[in-house]
């Protein structure tokens, strides 16, 4: 057989390798090595000192063989979130969120909607309050039929990432967070968009400290449409706001659910809060109401423009997709329209989309809550500054729409709106602000379960 080149090289080199080995064998006994010079190559003695001496005799610690501590993930259950996300924490988080949005600091990509069977929809949000803030995502769904099965209509999970490393630091149940952040944002809107002057009310006073209402009938008259978790949350936020609440009326399609809510309210309401009166129709609930919170998942309007008094604030939180419109376009046409986020509302708020398609609303007249808050904050120390609230007896809140009557023209020729509409879709920035606040509150209180990643 032919011999390969590699084999020939090996055979040729063998005599030279043998001669070199013989020389090394002769020299080694004459030059014994310093054991310290090879200590780094030798395994440590079992049970002995594993530290290595350097050439100067100094002892240096060995390089740690342990891996860095594995990061942990804080898990917050619904009960954990309820404990940490108090009314004060919720309100502060939402006020800060909209201020950041109004200043242009927040990072808010478009949300994702994934339709399902019937009216079911899955959603995904992501946002951060600023570039150096934690990134937060929320993935969940809305299943209106869950109510009949005794389950919440909304389920979600929220994840918070470390702003420096991107490592997930917290994951929390998102149902309570979504409910409370939505209602807290409505409370922020109520404080910014409604005043006693707008409704011609002279019997409404600023609430003291804990002040939640006036049970003698004076104070803000609130109407709640719907009987789900948002209805209850909005009632709680209303009585915890800056103005006293004198009356709460409730109207809902589901009478049994409404009865349960009223019974629960009478036993758990904050001290000093007024009774919740259950009425038969939405029209009855809206009669003389200063603030109307529409908290349904209806795809069609649930109230009429003629039921809403001049100067009222209508809060709509159920039209979170283009196919849902709980407020009629003729009422939108008469309103100053304020939304949580302009781009989101123009694409996905059913009330806004329907009014745009009907030609009774122009995109340029739509304001955002963040813009209002930033503008008002800038003018807070200027008593003569325009606060975008019409304060005479014949009008209401500020910069308008094109559906109001010409007879309502303001000093600069604008058409004054008859009412104000806060139309909320819900945005990821609200979740980001809420989740970070919940995580911080939970860590301070020692709430939650650490999990290894």
Give the predicted meaning of each segment:
Residues 197, 323-392, 406-453:
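Adenosine-phosphate binding glycine-rich loop
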Residues 35-38, 47-57, 61-65, 198-220, ...:
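Intrinsically disordered, low-complexity terminal tails and inter-domain linkers enriched
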Residues 186, 199-205, 214-239, 252-253, ...:
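Glycine-rich adenosine-cofactor-binding loop
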Residues 41-46, 51, 56-178, 185-187, ...:
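N-terminal ligand-binding/catalytic initiation module
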């Amino acid at each position: 057989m032919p011999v390969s080149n590699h084999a020939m090289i090996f055979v040729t080199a063998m005599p030279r390798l043998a001669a070199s080995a013989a020389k090394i064998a002769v020299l080694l006994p004459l030059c014994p090595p310093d054991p310290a010079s090879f200590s780094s190559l030798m395994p440590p003695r079992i049970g002995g000192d594993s530290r290595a001496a350097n050439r100067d005799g100094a002892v240096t610690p060995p390089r740690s063989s342990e891996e860095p501590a594995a990061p942990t993930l804080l898990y917050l259950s619904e009960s954990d979130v309820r404990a940490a996300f108090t009314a004060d924490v919720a309100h502060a988080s939402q006020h800060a969120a909209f201020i950041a949005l109004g200043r242009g600091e927040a990072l808010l990509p478009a949300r994702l909607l994934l339709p399902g069977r019937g009216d079911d929809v899955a959603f995904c949000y992501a946002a951060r309050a600023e570039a150096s803030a934690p990134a937060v995502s929320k993935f969940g769904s809305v299943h209106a039929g869950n109510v009949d099965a005794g389950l919440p209509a909304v389920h979600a999970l929220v994840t918070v990432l470390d702003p420096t490393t991107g490592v997930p630091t917290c994951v929390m149940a998102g149902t309570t967070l979504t409910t409370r952040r939505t209602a807290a944002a409505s409370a922020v809107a109520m404080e910014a968009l409604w005043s006693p002057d707008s409704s011609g009310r002279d019997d409404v006073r600023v609430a003291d400290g804990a002040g939640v209402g006036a049970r003698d009938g004076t104070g803000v008259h609130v109407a709640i449409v719907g009987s789900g978790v948002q209805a209850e949350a909005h009632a709680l936020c209303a009585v915890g706001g800056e103005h006293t609440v004198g009356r709460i009326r409730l109207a809902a399609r589901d009478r049994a659910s409404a009865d349960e809510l009223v019974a629960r309210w009478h036993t758990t309401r904050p001290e000093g809060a007024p009774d919740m009166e259950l009425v038969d129709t939405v029209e009855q609930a809206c009669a003389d109401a200063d603030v109307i919170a529409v908290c349904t998942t209806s795809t069609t309007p649930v109230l009429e423009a003629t039921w809403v008094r001049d100067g009222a604030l209508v809060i709509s939180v159920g039209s979170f997709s283009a196919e849902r419109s709980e407020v009629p376009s003729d009422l939108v046409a008469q309103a100053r329209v304020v939304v949580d986020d302009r781009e989101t509302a123009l694409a996905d708020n059913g009330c806004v989309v329907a009014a745009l398609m009907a030609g009774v609303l122009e995109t340029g007249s739509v304001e955002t809550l963040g813009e209002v808050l930033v503008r008002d904050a800038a003018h807070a120390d200027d008593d003569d500054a325009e606060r975008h609230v019409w304060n005479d007896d014949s009008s209401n809140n500020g910069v308008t729409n094109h559906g109001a009557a010409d007879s309502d023209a303001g000093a600069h020729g604008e058409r004054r709106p008859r009412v104000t509409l806060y139309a909320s879709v819900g945005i990821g920035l609200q979740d980001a602000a809420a989740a970070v606040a919940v995580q911080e509150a939970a860590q301070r209180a020692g709430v939650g379960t650490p999990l290894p990643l």
